[in-house]
């Protein structure tokens, strides 16, 4: 039989498992929202703990919270950040849209643990109150959006941006290494004029560089914190210096550029910062999907595809076809990019659906945002390590396809005109001739003229790959 204790909130008394630190409101949420399996992300829980830690420190400094209580709350928050109470935060994403129940989950856990630190007990006789002490100068309406921004910015800074930079560096190195390899270009999935493999990969590098700039451009808005706005943005029940000082405290303990939001009404009523930041992440997903698709097409084969590059062979690809190896890293990336694009739709809908002074789609928004960051960061790390770093050119195949391409005829445009060049290409294609044989047969130029004018290495321009 499970041992219980009695906890109380404004709705009355409720039984809670005696071995748990949470209280009445957490228990009610567990009983009322048994929906699916998605729980609040750990990084969001840690961001809530950071927020409570900063608030306790500032409330103490402002003379609003007794030093011993503040110290105990800070110690309890540090325990959460160290992962000591991970099973005390069981609530579902699918709860109140303001995140109130998760805010109270944190308040209750920290209050009960702080009470124990002070020599007290858990429950109704505890020495630290979840609302009056842990939640002092706060509302769920400003705490939860603050934690969202803290979790989002730290995830972008610590996980996504480093992996994006690493993948960009790998591809830049490949671009430089393959700068002298002339290959056929393709547009509309059809043969086009030549370029170098280095130039082709340099396009991927530039895509990722642009994406990094877009993501970095979104960070200042994410760094704006709602804390201090309390219920509707007016700052009711807060000290005049509280909002600025608590943002400064969060900036100090995270070494991140957090500031108090200049307009708390916007900070509470919208998710615009995360909508816009996720738009940049969606752009990255679009670029990664294109890059991964290009890689697997260029590596297709091994004998009946394009086969211009080789990628690492990491695992067997078929349960029935012996020896088959598939571009699995590319497939994983394209799948996760699809998920990111779906997340973007959900975040856009959530961001657009707030009413009046509060957006109430916040748990869903941050769940999808953090999932996107993790998918992209992990996906880029895996793709970089197990695919991109091992890309190698198949020079023999590249040369074969280059020499067989009819689009080399484009070099003749300035010598004999477009119409005659097109006639050469069509005759060569229809009769299975080389371009040279077709041109000579039509009498438009000699062998020597063809050799002098159709030189793929001179058709790639002076564009240098990478930066």
Swiss-Prot record:
Its EC number is 4.2.1.2. One of its GO terms (cellular component) is cytoplasm. GO terms for molecular function: fumarate hydratase activity. Transmembrane segments: none annotated. One of its GO terms (biological process) is tricarboxylic acid cycle. The record marks 331 as: Important for catalytic activity. It is an enzyme of class 4 (lyase). The keyword Nucleotidyltransferase does not apply. Belongs to the class-II fumarase/aspartase family. Fumarase subfamily. This is Fumarate hydratase class II. The gene is fumC.
């Amino acid at each position: 039989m499970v041992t219980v204790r009695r906890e109380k909130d404004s709705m009355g008394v409720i039984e809670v498992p005696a071995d748990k630190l949470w209280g009445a409101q957490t228990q009610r949420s567990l009983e009322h929202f048994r929906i699916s399996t998605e729980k609040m992300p750990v990084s969001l829980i840690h961001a809530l703990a950071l927020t409570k830690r900063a608030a306790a420190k500032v409330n103490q400094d402002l003379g609003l919270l007794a030093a011993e209580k503040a110290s105990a709350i800070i110690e309890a928050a540090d325990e959460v950040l160290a992962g000591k109470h991970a099973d005390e935060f069981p609530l579902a994403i699918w709860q109140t849209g303001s995140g109130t129940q998760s805010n109270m989950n944190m308040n209750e856990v920290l209050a009960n643990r702080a009470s124990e630190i002070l020599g007290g007990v858990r429950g109704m006789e505890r020495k630290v109150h979840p609302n009056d002490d842990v939640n002092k100068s706060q509302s769920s309406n400003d705490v939860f959006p603050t934690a969202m921004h803290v979790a989002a910015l730290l995830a972008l800074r610590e996980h996504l941006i480093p992996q994006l930079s690493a993948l960009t560096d790998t591809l830049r190195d490949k671009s430089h290494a393959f700068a002298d390899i002339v290959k056929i270009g393709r547009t509309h999935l059809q043969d086009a004029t030549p370029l170098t493999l280095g130039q082709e990969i340099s396009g991927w590098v530039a895509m990722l560089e642009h994406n990094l700039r877009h993501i970095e451009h979104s960070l200042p808005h994410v760094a704006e914190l709602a804390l201090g706005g309390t219920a509707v943005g007016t700052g009711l029940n807060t000290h005049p210096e509280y909002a600025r000082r608590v943002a400064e405290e969060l900036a100090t303990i995270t070494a991140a550029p957090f500031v108090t939001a200049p307009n708390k009404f916007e900070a509470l009523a919208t998710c615009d910062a995360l909508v816009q930041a996720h738009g940049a992440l969606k752009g990255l997903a679009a670029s990664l999907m294109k890059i991964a698709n290009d890689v697997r097409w260029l590596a297709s084969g091994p004998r009946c595809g394009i086969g211009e590059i080789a990628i690492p062979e990491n695992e067997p690809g078929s349960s029935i076809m012996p020896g088959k190896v598939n571009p699995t890293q590319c497939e994983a990336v394209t799948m996760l990019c699809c998920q990111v694009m779906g997340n973007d739709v959900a975040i856009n809908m959530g961001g657009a659906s707030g009413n009046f002074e509060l957006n109430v789609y916040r748990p869903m928004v941050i769940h999808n945002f953090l999932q996107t960051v993790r998918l992209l960061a992990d996906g880029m790390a895996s793709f970089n390590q197990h695919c991109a770093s091992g890309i190698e050119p198949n020079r023999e195949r590249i040369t074969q396809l280059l020499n067989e391409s009819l689009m080399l005829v484009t070099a003749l445009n300035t010598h004999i005109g477009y119409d005659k060049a097109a006639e050469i290409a069509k005759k060569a294609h229809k009769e299975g001739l080389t371009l040279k044989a077709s041109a000579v047969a039509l009498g438009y130029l000699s062998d020597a003229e063809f050799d002098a004018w159709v030189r793929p290495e001179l058709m790639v321009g002076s564009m240098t790959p990478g930066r």
